[in-house]
Design a protein with these regions (language model features):
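Extended substrate-binding grooves/exosites of carbohydrate-active enzymes
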Residues: 1-136, 140-146
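A short, sequence-level motif marking secondary-structure junctions
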Residues: 112-114, 155-158
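Edge beta-strands of extracellular beta-sandwich domains
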Residues: 145-157
Length: 158
């Protein structure tokens, strides 16, 4: 879901004549007869679940539209992963974000290195995690006022 919204955002950002963007719905909701995903009779296009738990896409829009300091590791609920992780993606409106796996830095990406239409999507590629153990995925976001925020996830390598 968040990947679709990232693609749409790129389209919106180059069309300066658009004066507004709208989200279809904030929350997933009941929809009799609908069969999609793993839940029947539910429209699952909301930014949050029916239980009001924010999905990744919620944090994408928060990083784009809000001035509130945001840093969020995506796909965090996918806890069990192959040891070769194709990418780690973080949504943040910070000036720079650093990724650490088990307290080892995998580099800091500056916002000025990102394309304008992806200025809140930070991606590290070809990351390896240890098999059979919980790996601590940590990001630290650095903001222009000198403050920082961190986010954590734990992924177990298969």
């Amino acid at each position: 879901q968040s990947q679709l919204h990232e693609i749409l955002w790129k389209q919106f950002s180059v069309r300066k004549y658009l004066w507004a963007e709208f989200i279809w719905c904030m929350f997933d909701f009941a929809s009799y007869g609908r069969v999609e995903g793993d839940t029947k009779s539910q429209n699952d296009k909301g930014l949050c679940t029916r239980e009001r738990i924010p999905k990744d896409v919620y944090f994408f829009y928060k990083s784009v539209w809000s001035s509130e300091k945001t840093v969020y590791i995506t796909e965090r609920r996918h806890e069990f992963r192959a040891c070769d992780v194709p990418f780690v993606k973080v949504y943040s409106n910070a000036d720079a974000v650093e990724l650490c796996i088990n307290d080892v830095s995998h580099g800091r990406i500056s916002r000025c290195e990102l394309p304008d239409d992806e200025s809140t999507v930070f991606v590290w590629k070809n990351i390896k995690i240890k098999p059979g153990t919980k790996n601590k995925i940590c990001t630290k976001a650095y903001f222009s006022d000198g403050t920082s925020r961190t986010d954590y996830a734990f992924w177990t390598g298969k």
